[in-house]
């Protein structure tokens, strides 16, 4: 199945990404969920309420690592193509956030705070050569359904479309 995601950009036609989900397999757990619609789509600021609910569920250990409304606004302003959600039956159950960085600026020895500019994202470089994944999650009630694979497939397609060299990932470890 080929799915198209289009990201509008300041009066231009926008960046269109085609993701091939044909190789994504589903297990029996998904069949028992009575899911009628799964969609990977661009994150919109209007999604923040649902997104925040999922954050609270994902990070339910009491840590305060939620992305703020302002941080999401910043990511959508500087790199809308890098911010996507997984929606199951109209409920946001997953999210992937990304920036572009230059490998020479981060190399292999960096901290999450360094690569994200202490979560200000001032390190995002549209002319960089690496797609850097700063967040990915699936709501606990929807894990094991291989939903995150769709977001990873999207990231691979985005990397190719933008002619980037590779994808790197980093993550925050609550209470570490």
Where do the PLM segments sit?
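Conserved acetyl-CoA-binding loop-helix of GNAT-fold acetyltransferases
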Residues: 144-159
